[in-house]
Design a protein with these regions (language model features):
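Active-site-proximal, substrate-binding regions of enzyme catalytic domains
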Residues: 45-73, 85
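Alpha-helix capping/helix-boundary segments
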Residues: 10-11, 40, 102, 119-120
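Active-site neighborhoods of divalent-metal-dependent phosphate/nucleic-acid chemistry enzymes
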Residues: 71-119
């Protein structure tokens, strides 16, 4: 397996035009494959809904962002990791279950993790994962 595990913070920054690094990370992932846990789709939909509700995006911009997200060459890991693994990672590295899912996928696939979440990046480094862009 090649590519990168991308969390919602990177995809959201790319879709909302908030960070130039996000575009680079998305491009890197598109070359080798973007891997995400199933919850990524829920988180990203929520980001777009909140941005629309807070008027950071117009309805047309939100539809465009949704189409861009849907067009990403994303490989979704359909089976969530066992609860015990998420719980153990969350406890050991002080993560939410959501962030633990990204870390677990990066560790299991032995792929770098792309994130703008400082706490998740710190935890991933402690767990032995590589951070994309480091």
């Amino acid at each position: 397996v090649s590519g990168v595990v991308i969390d919602c913070s990177v995809a959201a920054a790319w879709l909302l035009g908030e960070d130039d690094a996000a575009e680079s990370l998305i491009a890197v992932g598109a070359e080798g494959g973007i891997h995400v846990p199933a919850l990524w789709h829920l988180e990203l939909a929520n980001v777009l809904l909140v941005a629309l509700k807070r008027k950071r995006l117009t309805a047309a911009e939100a539809r465009t962002a949704e189409r861009l997200a849907a067009a990403l060459p994303v490989a979704t890991d359909s089976a969530p990791p066992p609860l015990g693994i998420l719980f153990a990672l969350g406890r050991e590295y002080d993560l939410t279950a959501y962030d633990a899912a990204y870390l677990e996928l990066a560790l299991r696939l032995d792929l770098p993790l792309a994130t703008f979440d400082a706490a998740l990046a710190r935890a991933a480094r402690k767990a032995g994962a590589t951070i994309a862009g480091d």
